[in-house]
Amino acid sequence: MARSFYSHIKEAWRSPKEGKLAELQWQRKQEWRDEGAIERIERPTRLDKARELGYKAKQGVVVARVSVRKGGSRKQRHKAGRRSKRQGVNRLSRRKSIQRISEERASRKYRNLRVLNSYWVGEDGSQKWHEVILVDPNHPAIENDGDLGWIASDDHKGRAFRGLTSAGTKGRGQRTRGTGTEKTRPSVTGNDRQGK
Protein backbone atom coordinates (compact mmCIF):
# COMPACT_ATOMS: atom_id res chain seq x y z
CA MET A 1 0.00 0.00 0.00
CA ALA A 2 1.31 3.44 -0.97
CA ARG A 3 2.29 5.75 1.88
CA SER A 4 0.98 9.27 2.09
CA PHE A 5 3.10 12.37 1.63
CA TYR A 6 2.44 13.33 5.26
CA SER A 7 3.76 10.01 6.59
CA HIS A 8 7.16 10.73 5.00
CA ILE A 9 7.31 14.18 6.63
CA LYS A 10 6.32 12.68 9.98
CA GLU A 11 9.00 10.00 9.77
CA ALA A 12 11.70 12.56 8.96
CA TRP A 13 10.71 14.71 11.96
CA ARG A 14 10.96 11.74 14.36
CA SER A 15 14.74 12.22 14.25
CA PRO A 16 15.43 15.79 13.06
CA LYS A 17 19.16 15.50 13.82
CA GLU A 18 19.66 12.74 11.24
CA GLY A 19 19.43 12.43 7.47
CA LYS A 20 18.59 15.23 5.05
CA LEU A 21 16.49 17.09 7.61
CA ALA A 22 19.55 17.67 9.82
CA GLU A 23 21.30 19.77 7.17
CA LEU A 24 18.08 21.58 6.30
CA GLN A 25 17.46 22.42 9.97
CA TRP A 26 21.04 23.70 10.31
CA GLN A 27 20.45 26.10 7.42
CA ARG A 28 17.07 27.18 8.78
CA LYS A 29 18.47 28.03 12.20
CA GLN A 30 21.08 30.29 10.60
CA GLU A 31 18.22 32.33 9.13
CA TRP A 32 15.94 32.13 12.18
CA ARG A 33 18.63 33.58 14.46
CA ASP A 34 18.72 36.76 12.37
CA GLU A 35 14.93 37.17 12.43
CA GLY A 36 12.79 38.81 15.08
CA ALA A 37 11.35 37.02 18.10
CA ILE A 38 7.91 36.71 16.45
CA GLU A 39 7.75 36.27 12.68
CA ARG A 40 4.66 35.62 10.59
CA ILE A 41 5.36 32.93 7.99
CA GLU A 42 3.59 31.97 4.77
CA ARG A 43 3.34 28.24 5.39
CA PRO A 44 4.10 25.79 8.22
CA THR A 45 7.54 24.17 8.51
CA ARG A 46 5.95 20.90 9.65
CA LEU A 47 2.90 20.56 7.43
CA ASP A 48 1.90 17.17 8.84
CA LYS A 49 1.92 18.42 12.45
CA ALA A 50 0.14 21.66 11.56
CA ARG A 51 -2.64 19.77 9.78
CA GLU A 52 -3.00 17.42 12.75
CA LEU A 53 -3.48 20.42 15.03
CA GLY A 54 -6.15 22.06 12.87
CA TYR A 55 -4.24 24.17 10.33
CA LYS A 56 -5.94 24.85 7.00
CA ALA A 57 -4.50 26.77 4.04
CA LYS A 58 -7.34 29.27 3.90
CA GLN A 59 -8.17 32.87 4.72
CA GLY A 60 -8.33 33.63 8.42
CA VAL A 61 -5.61 31.13 9.41
CA VAL A 62 -2.13 32.50 10.20
CA VAL A 63 1.12 30.83 11.31
CA ALA A 64 3.80 32.65 13.33
CA ARG A 65 7.22 31.36 14.39
CA VAL A 66 8.18 32.43 17.92
CA SER A 67 11.58 32.14 19.60
CA VAL A 68 11.91 32.05 23.39
CA ARG A 69 15.12 31.80 25.44
CA LYS A 70 15.84 28.43 27.04
CA GLY A 71 16.29 27.84 30.74
CA GLY A 72 14.54 28.86 33.94
CA SER A 73 13.16 32.19 35.03
CA ARG A 74 15.23 35.36 34.97
CA LYS A 75 14.78 36.67 38.51
CA GLN A 76 16.42 39.76 39.96
CA ARG A 77 17.80 39.86 43.49
CA HIS A 78 15.26 41.31 45.95
CA LYS A 79 16.23 44.64 47.48
CA ALA A 80 14.08 44.25 50.61
CA GLY A 81 14.52 41.61 53.30
CA ARG A 82 13.05 38.14 53.10
CA ARG A 83 13.54 34.86 54.89
CA SER A 84 15.89 32.44 53.18
CA LYS A 85 13.16 30.36 51.56
CA ARG A 86 11.76 33.39 49.72
CA GLN A 87 15.09 34.87 48.68
CA GLY A 88 15.71 32.49 45.79
CA VAL A 89 17.05 33.82 42.51
CA ASN A 90 18.88 30.93 40.81
CA ARG A 91 17.58 27.48 39.89
CA LEU A 92 13.97 28.67 39.76
CA SER A 93 11.80 27.69 36.82
CA ARG A 94 8.60 29.24 35.54
CA ARG A 95 5.39 27.39 36.29
CA LYS A 96 4.57 27.28 32.59
CA SER A 97 6.35 25.71 29.64
CA ILE A 98 8.29 27.61 27.00
CA GLN A 99 5.67 26.49 24.49
CA ARG A 100 2.96 28.25 26.52
CA ILE A 101 5.11 31.38 26.71
CA SER A 102 5.43 31.26 22.90
CA GLU A 103 1.65 31.05 22.49
CA GLU A 104 1.08 33.98 24.85
CA ARG A 105 3.63 36.17 23.08
CA ALA A 106 2.11 35.45 19.67
CA SER A 107 -1.36 36.20 21.07
CA ARG A 108 -0.14 39.54 22.44
CA LYS A 109 1.31 40.55 19.09
CA TYR A 110 -1.72 39.51 17.02
CA ARG A 111 -4.47 40.77 19.31
CA ASN A 112 -7.32 40.21 16.86
CA LEU A 113 -6.43 36.52 16.45
CA ARG A 114 -6.87 33.53 18.74
CA VAL A 115 -4.34 30.77 19.32
CA LEU A 116 -5.52 27.43 17.97
CA ASN A 117 -2.43 25.36 18.76
CA SER A 118 1.35 25.24 18.48
CA TYR A 119 4.22 22.82 17.91
CA TRP A 120 8.01 22.61 18.27
CA VAL A 121 10.18 23.27 15.20
CA GLY A 122 13.70 23.53 16.58
CA GLU A 123 16.14 24.63 19.26
CA ASP A 124 19.78 25.48 19.76
CA GLY A 125 21.90 26.15 22.84
CA SER A 126 20.10 29.32 23.85
CA GLN A 127 16.57 29.33 22.41
CA LYS A 128 13.59 27.26 21.29
CA TRP A 129 11.39 27.89 18.28
CA HIS A 130 7.68 27.05 18.14
CA GLU A 131 5.19 27.70 15.37
CA VAL A 132 1.84 29.00 16.60
CA ILE A 133 -1.36 28.57 14.58
CA LEU A 134 -3.63 31.60 14.97
CA VAL A 135 -7.20 32.03 13.74
CA ASP A 136 -9.24 35.17 13.00
CA PRO A 137 -12.58 34.61 14.82
CA ASN A 138 -14.31 37.41 12.87
CA HIS A 139 -13.46 36.18 9.38
CA PRO A 140 -16.50 34.77 7.49
CA ALA A 141 -14.39 31.85 6.23
CA ILE A 142 -13.74 30.83 9.85
CA GLU A 143 -17.24 31.52 11.19
CA ASN A 144 -18.71 29.24 8.50
CA ASP A 145 -16.08 26.51 8.84
CA GLY A 146 -17.41 23.31 10.37
CA ASP A 147 -14.07 22.45 11.97
CA LEU A 148 -12.88 25.89 13.15
CA GLY A 149 -16.13 27.80 13.70
CA TRP A 150 -16.22 26.98 17.43
CA ILE A 151 -13.28 29.34 18.10
CA ALA A 152 -15.41 32.34 17.09
CA SER A 153 -17.44 31.98 20.31
CA ASP A 154 -16.72 34.47 23.10
CA ASP A 155 -15.98 31.50 25.39
CA HIS A 156 -12.61 31.21 23.66
CA LYS A 157 -11.35 34.75 24.19
CA GLY A 158 -7.79 34.78 25.55
CA ARG A 159 -7.38 31.00 25.16
CA ALA A 160 -3.59 31.14 25.46
CA PHE A 161 -3.65 33.16 28.70
CA ARG A 162 -6.27 30.94 30.34
CA GLY A 163 -4.41 27.70 29.62
CA LEU A 164 -7.05 26.34 27.23
CA THR A 165 -4.71 25.33 24.41
CA SER A 166 -3.20 21.85 24.23
CA ALA A 167 0.06 23.02 25.83
CA GLY A 168 -1.94 24.91 28.46
CA THR A 169 -4.05 21.94 29.55
CA LYS A 170 -0.90 19.81 29.78
CA GLY A 171 0.84 22.37 31.99
CA ARG A 172 -2.19 22.58 34.28
CA GLY A 173 -2.19 18.81 34.79
CA GLN A 174 -5.48 18.26 32.96
CA ARG A 175 -4.22 15.50 30.65
CA THR A 176 -4.84 12.70 33.15
CA ARG A 177 -7.76 11.75 35.36
CA GLY A 178 -8.25 9.69 38.49
CA THR A 179 -5.76 8.68 41.17
CA GLY A 180 -2.95 11.15 41.65
CA THR A 181 -4.66 14.09 39.97
CA GLU A 182 -7.13 15.02 42.71
CA LYS A 183 -5.42 18.37 43.35
CA THR A 184 -5.45 19.55 39.72
CA ARG A 185 -9.20 20.13 39.54
CA PRO A 186 -10.96 22.50 39.35
CA SER A 187 -7.53 24.14 39.02
CA VAL A 188 -4.04 23.97 40.48
CA THR A 189 -4.43 27.32 42.27
CA GLY A 190 -7.85 26.23 43.56
CA ASN A 191 -6.00 23.60 45.61
CA ASP A 192 -3.25 25.90 46.93
CA ARG A 193 -0.83 24.69 44.23
CA GLN A 194 -0.66 21.22 45.78
CA GLY A 195 -1.34 19.50 42.45
CA LYS A 196 1.86 20.60 40.76
From Swiss-Prot:
**Gene3D superfamilies in the cross-refs:** Ribosomal protein l15e
Q: Name one GO molecular function term.
A: structural constituent of ribosome
Q: Which NCBIfam families match?
A: PRK04243.1
Composition skew (Basic residues), residue ranges = 69-98
InterPro entries with a match to the protein in the record:
Rbsml_eL15_core_dom_sf, Ribosomal_eL15, Ribosomal_eL15_arc, Ribosomal_eL15_CS, Ribosomal_uL23/eL15/eS24_sf
Species of provenance: Halorubrum lacusprofundi (strain ATCC 49239 / DSM 5036 / JCM 8891 / ACAM 34)
User: Is the keyword Ribosomal protein in the record?
Assistant: yes
Q: Which family does it belong to?
A: Belongs to the eukaryotic ribosomal protein eL15 family.
Question: Gene encoding this polypeptide?
Answer: rpl15e
Q: Which GO terms describe its biological process?
A: cytoplasmic translation
Compositionally biased, Polar residues: which spans?
186-196
GO CC entries? cytosolic large ribosomal subunit
Ranges where the record places region Disordered: 69-100, 161-196
Kindly state which keywords UniProt assigns to this record, in alphabetical order. Answer: Ribonucleoprotein, Ribosomal protein
Q: What is this protein called?
A: Large ribosomal subunit protein eL15
Q: What SMART domains does this protein map onto?
A: Ribosomal_L15e
Q: Does the keyword Ribonucleoprotein apply?
A: yes
